[in-house]
From Swiss-Prot:
Membrane topology recorded in Swiss-Prot or TrEMBL: Multi-pass membrane protein
Major localization class: membrane
Residues annotated as binding Zn(2+) 1: C69, C72, H95, C98
UniProt name for this protein: E3 ubiquitin-protein ligase MARCHF3
Gene of this entry: marchf3
Amino acid sequence: MTTSRCSHLPEVLPDCTSSAPSGKTVEDCSSLVNGQPQYVMQVSAKDGQLLSTVVRTLTTQSFNDRPMCRICHEGSTQEDLLSPCECTGTLGTIHRSCLEHWLSSSNTSYCELCHFRFSVERKPRPLVEWLRNPGPQHEKRTLFGDMVCFLFITPLATISGWLCLRGAVDHLHFSSRLEAVGLIALTVALFTIYLFWTLVSFRYHCRLYNEWRRTNQRVILVIPKSANLPSAQQSLLGLHSFKRNSKETIV
């Protein structure tokens, strides 16, 4: 049986003959015109009879076989690919930054496919980052409104309390005890309401901050050196895969 393969442009697919002896595989005869994709035509024959012809794109096949990140689907041009878990094939390689971002967003420490537990270090994010972006839109509005109210009510309550106490002292000097007691009671009620509102708001936002801090930690992946797949090795694997697929024989 004889198998031959030629590469041409999609507009022209002439016959490709081979003078190789029976049982041998003819090497590829390929050409790339104007940088366009190569189309491979595989012809299989036995004892002079045509068995099958297959046309496929060579460049697409070789591109799909190259290692890429399973999250962003990019190669190792910008960042080296890692193989930190027990996943194999196209799901076995991933960028370090992509994995750290996914572990931080999902608040997990294991692979969702093979359930391999990663070795990670979690560091809490600073308070300033939470103040800039506390979470959902309604939490942003609540935080902004409470901060404005606190900045406005605090000096107002302080001045009102001071004026009430000053008036109570003046009424005591003029023997007006009833008015003095009323002003003192008003001052106590004013500060009680102010402190109650401040404590409730502060406790509410502390709970939101603790929840945000727990679910939005900075994740640092700790990977042994043996798990790191260098970019040169990735390129070599892609080249071997390219050659292996180019020499397939379809009968």
